[in-house]
UniProtKB/Swiss-Prot annotation:
It is an enzyme of class 2 (transferase). The modification N6-acetyllysine is found at residue 230. This is DNA polymerase alpha catalytic subunit. It comes from Rattus norvegicus. Keywords: Acetylation, Cytoplasm, DNA replication, DNA-binding, DNA-directed DNA polymerase, Metal-binding, Nucleotidyltransferase, Nucleus, Phosphoprotein, Transferase, Zinc, Zinc-finger. Component of the alpha DNA polymerase complex (also known as the alpha DNA polymerase-primase complex) consisting of four subunits: the catalytic subunit POLA1, the regulatory subunit POLA2, and the primase complex subunits PRIM1 and PRIM2 respectively. Interacts with PARP1; this interaction functions as part of the control of replication fork progression. Interacts with MCM10 and WDHD1; these interactions recruit the polymerase alpha complex to the pre-replicative complex bound to DNA.
Amino acid sequence: MAPVHGDDCKLETSAVSDSGSFVASRARREKKSKKGRQEALERLKKAKAGEKYKYEVEDLTSVYEEVDEEQYSKLVQARQDDDWIVDDDGIGYVEDGREIFDDDLEDDALDTCGEGSDGKAHRKDRKDVKKPSVTKPNNIKAMFIASAGKKTTDKTVDLSKDDLLGDILQDLNTETPQIAPPPVLIPKKKRSTGASPNPFSVHTATAVPSGKIASPVSRKEPPLTPVPLKRAEFAGDLAQPECPEDEQESGVIEFEDGDFDEPMDTEEVDEEEPVTAKIWDQESEPVEGVKHEADPETGTTSFLDSFLPDVSCWDIDQKDENSFLLQEVQVDSNHLPLVKGADDEQVFQFYWLDAYEDPYNQPGVVFLFGKVWVESAKTHVSCCVMVKNIERTLYFLPREMKIDLNTGKETATPITMKDVYEEFDSKISAKYKIMKFKSKIVEKNYAFEIPDVPEKSEYLEVRYSAEVPQLPQNLKGETFSHVFGTNTSSLELFLMNRKIKGPCWLEVKNPQLLNQPISWCKFEAMALKPDLVNVIKDVSPPPLVVMSFSMKTMQNVQNHQHEIIAMAALVHHNFPLDKAPPKPPFQTHFCVVSKPKDCIFPCAFKEVIKKKNMEVEVAATERTLLGFFLAKVHKLDPDILVGHNICGFELEVLLQRINECKVPFWSKIGRLRRSNMPKLGSRSGFGERNATCGRMICDVEISVKELIHCKSYHLSELVQQILKTERIVIPTENIRNMYSEPSHLLYLLEHIWKDARFILQIMCELNVLPLALQITNIAGNIMSRTLMGGRSERNEFLLLHAFYENNYIVPDKQIFRKPQQKPGDEDEEIDGDTNKYKKGRKKAAYAGGLVLDPKVGFYDKFILLLDFNSLYPSIIQEFNICFTTVQRVASETLKATEDEEQEQIPELPDPNLDMGILPREIRKLVERRKQVKQLMKQQDLNPDLVLQYDIRQKALKLTANSMYGCLGFSYSRFYAKPLAALVTYKGREILMHTKEMVQKMNLEVIYGDTDSIMINTNSTNLEEVFKLGNKVKNEVNKLYKLLEIDIDGVFKSLLLLKKKKYAALVVEPTSDGNYITKQELKGLDIVRRDWCDLAKDTGNFVIGQILSDQSRDTIVENIQKRLIEIGENVLNGSVPVSQFEINKALTKDPQDYPDKKSLPHVHVALWINSQGGRKVKAGDTVSYVICQDGSNLPATQRAYAPEQLQKQDNLAIDTQYYLAQQIHPVVARICEPIDGIDAVLIALWLGLDSTQFRVHQYHKDEENDALLGGPAQLTDEEKYKDCEKFKCLCPSCGTENIYDNVFEGSGMDMEPSLNRCSNIDCKASPATFMVQLSNKLIMDIRRCIKKYYDGWLICEEPTCRNRIRRLPLHFSRNGPLCPACMKAVLRPEYSDKSLYTQLCFYRYIFDADCALEKLPEHEKDKLKKQFFTPRVLQDYRKVKNIAEHFLSWSG
């Protein structure tokens, strides 16, 4: 709308009269005055006469007010602050302060980029403004006016959802500038010195010094509108120079490249609004007319002080961040920063960090991303180098004789290399449309598992363009038997041929500029062939830009999708890879918050942010938030994105939401420009990793798993274990309530900001990046893959480099399809017994390490532990075991022998052979580590250098120790089962030989495992123990060149329970000649995560007591007191809930388990995923508690997440479960070798029913009986102690009499058990009721027999106790596997031995003849005379015969 003249205004307002009549108010023709006509005729005459026409200029009143620049700025600011819309219902109509003619500029800009197919520009959708209602006149005039005033309106079109238009606009944005600005370095405006690096810290405003004028408001930026972007802006500028004049000239800012460091204007926008992303104005005043119920400043402060933690209490060095001057670099991307190379020619030198290839869309092309030095700016900036024309390289192995492919039979025609060439040229190239190729004859070596391939032979090497599809892997011809290299990737060929081992400096000769931008990097170059790229050695790496970020999501209750509501990031712009991590680990930060769709921001939230001087951007919608984050990522250009669970959850959610919200230029999350987002949600995370190519992902969860062992890898646990501090967890269901008050929302943002800092601190504490760089340089793979874990790939690349350098053909990659995993595969071995296999677990491919049978018991004398240093790598070196040296059986023959019991072990190589490649590579690693450790011992070393050396030696050790793994890993590219079997065979042989040697020295070996042995010294003198250890060490080491055994430790006392399970007090000598002890646990329940903390603490107490120097009686007494106390505490509810939490890891995604209900951790994991906030997946640890919920379900189906227990009143901790199946088994197993403590006693002390533990005790006693030579050596009392006593009611008084022997009493008071009733007042004798007694015995015997034939089986695992009658199909060597726990075997609840013993017991208690024979003669005579008359003896024999009768049936 243009400015309106004053007279026109009057005409417009008087156009309609008050009468409302159309006729009366219609415009009339006005009569012209006569004077006017005369003047006009006069002018016409003069014109005809030839006189010049003189134009008379009338004086017009100006419609514009002229002001200076300062006044104009104030006027615009006043307009912005003025809320001039009355009662807009909060819909967010905005006045941005610009003049009306500014809209024309904006519309013109839209016309240039948003013109549709009809040639008309689509204008921006605008919000409807609520206006006062006006009564419509009911006359014909209103109809005419309305129809005349209508304009045709175009249908609203969402430009952001038009992918084709987006691609066109992206191409338009890449115009080449005519004049490129020179590279300049512009310092960014400094923040105030009082600002804290924490955006949530509260500071009092400082007074402005005199002489300086404080600006009352900060500069406002115009709204963000997409416009065509010049090439210089796109590829060079991270941000525009902060000059107001330049900004006013440009008028608009392009969304994705805007400078987001300053506060930005925003208002609420429609979710469907496609064009502009706006950010709330942090500096604007609150909307007038809104009444606040409480003072926001006072309320926030008091709430934060009383409840919410304050980040300002952290030890933050404010000077470090405040002194950092962010340098924004402008570069001319049309002129590459070339330098002089080794040959004095201009080359492009850069440090490569990451590589990417797209074999389907751009075959034969590799993108290298890294950093390049810009001399004019004195800094490193990002760059992308496109390496083209990487050819496929194939090797054809010629046959000896030509074969007929139809029949498969050989002919008599010998083959020459020319025949191979002709077959490829005439048949293969034509069939697979290879129009152009190169070939030559080469000599290559081969040393792998394909049979009938010679060790050395001539091959036909064929090279052709990668744009032609690859040949089949199993291709065979008449003249050639094998083709190698069909599926080798372009990236692998490039890295191997150019000998590039991990991130390093590269130089590109003859670099070419690209016509169209392919990346978001500052510089882009192209190498037309891979030979133009060369390695520059021994130059230190440049500093990188590292961004740590954290985000908070909420699940939409309608569509159950995760929506991002807030993000925080910390950035360090010069993070070194070869020095100690910087302190603090970040220099700048940003935070952005949005809101769920069904929430509103708290009242005066912006005002609180403003008053507290917080750097928080407020986004009206999730789309705005995501756009802001992408713009920030593009501007800051981080090389590494750091997060926790970023690969398993956050990155997938982030990309899904970007895609869902149609945020433009999604690919800025990485460095490669792409329009189509890769497929997300795959289990391998392949699409998510590809989306960020060029920016490495560092997931601290993955890194920590490789470096340290934790109970779980949740962020809270890592913060506690590594940073030794506490992290507060905000439940997902509480997030929505955080939007009720500004203080609550600020606390949420503070929490997210803290998480980002925790993540960064964990990364620095473990030196994740320097270690990953060193490992990558050693292995020669890609650093982004190293950060993702996976040792197999690192070993693969290390061997690939080694075999390529030695002119070997390497094995092709195989595509493996893992078989469907069966239920129960996720569980571990039972009690470490390698003979017990899990359900569905196939037999081991080859025998592993030897584990000697332990001599179970408690040792209170010094135990010596000897250990071979790096046993398997040392064996490989000692015996020269390699692909190239060991003769293996052909794979067909090997498969035929796989099912046989006897394992085929290849012979050792000839000692005179040259060292193979595998032992040579391991020796290199070992020797390099020794050199680095020697360097570390130098005096006066720089601390940074010491750290660098330490990281390098750790990387060398990790790599060397994992080398053996690639031989035995069936999915490895270098899998060689015979070699792995030979290594483990020699390991078993060496351990057994060492044991025999020690025994010959008259020493007792009590245990041994793979590479270590334990020796009982029977000494209490530590000095003598070390002398003895050195003696054994010297004797063993004499036998080998490279194998070394060493003293690994001395135990003061040892509790050896079974294989791989022991507890010990380790001796650590001190400088003063004494020693201290430290407790060490191996394989016990209390070191496993799937036991609750209460059980672990109890187990630790018991072990501490057993290992102490106290007497046995004191130890038993202390354990008894402690268990009684724990039982009472659990029943009283005085134990915190956290002590009951059980942690168990998922081996696959929760939805992939077939029996979800019976696995408690899977059941809880599914519930967690359904709630939103986080997603648990394979490899994650799930915490749960077993509760009483009023149902009769088994304990495994009554598992709940801890937060469920807190929220649901009907849930309570199942105390019986924790006492019987958590605490009892742990303590019982530890106390098993201790005299005076058994499972029944432990149950009694814990307040449990001891009868349910007698079955387990009985089976243990059966095993002990077998060891002792059977029941023959046991007394009657021992033999029948667990039998059910015979009970019979007295017919006279009804008292229950219990019989367990022929006699009652002892000595002089001995009498027959049937002589009198146990009731003193009853005078009747049971011997007079023999018929009733006989009938009761028959009924009891029948009941026992029925119990046996019921066939109930019970799991012998105390934590399971599953009862089942159906015999399962899965068996181990020890019996049928329990289908519930899949860990232990099932035993008969009432075995045949139990029945037989019970029947023998019934016979025994009535066998008077046998009982009398065992008595001394004088006692026997006395009893016969007094009690055992012939009639009584006859009665006893009758009852005994009943038992004899049933025993005769048992066979």
